[in-house]
Amino acid sequence: MSGSYPFIDIAALDSVREGFARGDAQLVLAHDLSTVLWVNGPGAKLFGYNRVEDLIEGQLDLPVATRRQIAAFSSENTSAPSAVAVRLGGGLRSELTHLHVSNIKLPDGVAALLVATQMPDNSAEAAISGLGDDSTHIALVDTVGKVVAASPRFALLDISASTLEDLIVEAGDATDRIVKRRIRTGSHSVPGAIARLTDTPALHLLCIVGDAPAQFQTAAEAVPLPDNAEAVLEEILPEQGDAPAQQAQKTHAEQPRPKTFAFDHDAPPARFIWKVGPDGTFSEISPDLAAVVGPNSADIVGRRFSDVANVFGFYTDGSIAALLLERDTWSGKRLLWPVEGTRLRVPVELAALPVYSRDREFLGFRGFGIVRPAEAEADPEEIGLALAGGIPQNRKPRKEPAETARMVGEDDVLALSEEVANDDQPAAVLPKPPLDITPTPGRRDSDKVISLLNSCAQEKVAADQAKFLKEKERATRPEGGLTKTERNAFREIAERLRKQGLANTRAESETPVSETSSIEPVEPTPPVKTRSEPIQPDETALLANLPVPVIIHSGDAIHYVNQALLDITGYESLDDIRSAGGVDVLFNSESDDGETRQSMVLRHADGSEEPVDTHLNAIAWRGGRALMLSLMPVTAADLPAPAELPAANDEEKQALEAHVEELKTILDTATDGVVLIDPEGRIRSMNHSASALFGYERDEAEGKFFSMLFAIESQRAAMDYLHGLSGNGVLSVLNDGREVIGREAKGGFIPLFMTIGKLPHTRGFCAVLRDITQWKRTEEELTNARKEAERASNQKTEFLARISHEIRTPLNAIIGFSELMADEKFGPIGNDRYRDYLRDINRSGNHVLALVNDLLDISKIEAGALDMQFEAVSLNDAIGEAIALMQPQANRERVIIRSSFQSNLPDIVADSRSIKQVALNLLSNAVRFTAPGGQVIVSTSYELNGDVVMRVRDTGIGMSKSEVEQALKPFRQINALEGRKAESAKDWRNEGTGLGLPLTKAMVEANRAQFAIDSNPGQGTVVEIVFPPTRVLAD
């Protein structure tokens, strides 16, 4: 079916699906009221079309008046349907039709109009009318998998009942009510989709895209048989009875046979591609695998990986299934794959890569595998023989009726295994057996319903059963207590119980496809008894006389037990077994230590247990289906001889238990709280520290959600942390923990630091919780201290700024007037002493002004408020300008300033003004503390490690280490040694503000450089400033 949108996507919309299920005529139009986007069968019929395809994507020619009426109601911005009466058709045939018009949103968000009306014929067949062709098949399926209505060729697809049940379950679990995947039809799989239309009662729309098998197409084109087909056959059979049996065999031999598979042991390794969906279902596999292991063995598309692994026997530790759940890349996983038609299995290595959509939606895995036929090994379970379609060719059929009856149970179990490997394959033509295998509605072709014919056959079965038991006592049973066919049967039973309990089995109304075989005269089959009919004595005569314990049951419901079972278990009657608990009370599959047993254990009425071997058959019982379970006690000869290994295992187990106890003790001793969480987010257990931390008893918190341990404002953060780890995202790699607020049992709150890790085997989590109350208290104290220090610093800066403003104004007046008076511009000063006083006033004023400026600069640096403009600065040029400014003062002091600048010195990243100020401060101190005749040497260099270094060396008086420490403190001056004075008898070290070196060091560090000073008394001082490579603009 054509169209811009898949038919089933629109049929599953909430505004469409219920009307579709009722059989309403529905039409989805674009807003131009001409383009038909979607229509169902009744809707196409309403406008005169027989098929949906004839109208979808076409132009609908509505009358102008009808368009106007629909457009008037569709302009309302509401999704509620509006009723409108219009006339459809033309001339005398026009009819008044009541339509319901509503606005809907298509799957891609495009707005459209839904036009619908009720139709007289609301049957299921009418709902899907106009749909389906040679390559498209439509069906309506109810809640139990029954096909309510279908397109003509749907039955030819041969979809099994179990497949329909799986599709119904998946559609019910889907959030958008649609499941799209490949669906198994007969021996192949084709693309299809199923949508859940209604919930009460449940009704599903199933769409399949694919041609029916060729052998069924011919049958579909043939004329159906009339109702009196049986009478016609009775007339034809005598006429053909004279033909010899060789003619029938010749006819069968002349039919074309499918090409058989032959395993090539010497073939080179083959590489194949495979894909699975988000649920682990195989969606694609390349034919390279089938070329090595056989087509039946590689026909796994549409099946879950866990199911295939369970049937093929390579589900050992579940590691691959766990990797499929983790959604991460993996490789190097090895398993053994059975080879069709052989007793071999070949090693296969698998690797996979997760696939995501653009919206990071997980789409499944895409991987490759390598199969190595040259390394094939023997398969103890011989699964490959079952995949080949039955008994190997070198086995001769047994013609004796008794032998055939004895092997029926095993053949039936084999048929169950074959159904898993090759679902619904046509059965081979076999001679008529002494047991009548009658088809029953609700069962697939591979299920066998056995009805016993006569007392003679019953006696033969009993004799052969007794003979079989004697031979079994002498034979050595395989490992695990079960034969390969029995083990395959149990796998199939587990598969079916997983999908749907046998207690809820039902009879389906569809008639199974008959097997292809030559026509032979048959004896009339006794009618099947209904449940209401009383049990006939001959129906249970064989079972009652058997010496083997037998149970007839369906799921947990027990229908019949024989006397041998009552004798071995110690129960008086069947009612006693039912009242004690039924099937569950009879069997125990776990040992005392909780480990799963390899064989079944029968529990007696007194509580004692006995190992038994089991044999399972599918039989007809009271007109329905049931399972017959026969038990064979395991004798002492069958049990393995005691060895020294169990003793060693006991010692190892005791050591392991002691180690576990030690670990528990360590966890309880730890001061941090440890909480174990299951995959659903519930608390499994906690140690003593966690119990004391939150005030909960261990058993009180177990089973409750992990979020109960946190305050409301931290619950979301804690659960997001947990979900982030389960999704294999960034948190699973960068797990840095979380700070949360815990909630005590009494309502108090605790600050906690939480770290969660994943547990590898249980898929759970482990949370470690640490009480950080003391950390928070210390952090709060440090925060308060920092705030107090910042407040004091701001107060000091504010005070200095205010004092500076108050001092600058009178200082400027004093300095200005003193300079004016010293210049005698308004008249001479009669006395030279007054001139000296004026010079002292001017010098003192400038000194105080420099002090105020230095105070402001150092306060700004300490507060981080100094305005600095970082740019490329030429260090040589900055120092050269400072030398030029200090040269007059050095000449007056008779101090020589020498410079040594490295050529091609790279620029540095610094504040130009502060670099000049640093150079001036260092040169000023060097000139001031150097005696006349001394030298000051300024140099720059570019080191090999990328550093740029500035050095200022003088030959002055120098300082000791204690004096250097004192000089680097603000407002501290060196008041020391007498005798080191200038020629004017004035101690130059008592001059200054005491801020020169501290301010210089602060400016250097503000420019991200390093400040160092080295001085010795009487030898001079060296100041070194290093700019690291990160502050150097090298070429």
UniProtKB/Swiss-Prot annotation:
Coiled-coil portions: none
The organism's place on the tree of life at top rank: Bacteria
Any Pfam family matching the protein: HisKA
InterPro entries in UniProt: HATPase_C_sf, His_kinase_dom, HisK_dim/P_dom, HisK_dim/P_sf, PAS, PAS-like_dom_sf, PAS_fold, PdhS_histid_kinase
UniProt region (Important for polar localization), positions on chain: 1-613
Keywords associated with the record: ATP-binding, Cell cycle, Cell division, Cytoplasm, Kinase, Nucleotide-binding, Phosphoprotein, Transferase
Major localization class: cytoplasm
Region: Interaction with DivK, residue numbers: 614-1035
Subcellular location(s) per record: Cytoplasm
CDD domains registered for this protein in UniProt: HisKA, PAS
Entry keyword Transport: no
GO CC terms of this entry: cytoplasm; plasma membrane
Modified residues (Phosphohistidine): 805
Region of interest (Disordered), residue spans: 500-533
SMART domains: HATPase_c, HisKA, PAS
Catalytic activity: ATP + protein L-histidine = ADP + protein N-phospho-L-histidine
Keyword ATP-binding tagged: yes
GO molecular function: ATP binding; histidine phosphotransfer kinase activity; phosphorelay sensor kinase activity
Span of domain PAS: 659-730
NCBIfam families registered for this protein in UniProt: histid_kinase_PdhS, sensory_box
Assembly, per entry: Interacts with DivK.
Function: Functions as a polar differentiation marker. Essential protein that, by localizing in the old pole of dividing cells, controls cell division and maturation, probably through control of DivK phosphorylation status and cellular distribution, which in turn regulates CtrA, a transcriptional regulator of the minB operon. The asymmetrical localization of this protein is probably required for cells to enter a new division cycle.
Identification of the protein by name: Cell-division control histidine kinase PdhS
Organism, scientific name: Brucella suis (strain ATCC 23445 / NCTC 10510)
UniProt lineage: Bacteria, Pseudomonadati, Pseudomonadota, Alphaproteobacteria, Hyphomicrobiales
Encoding gene, per UniProt annotation: pdhS
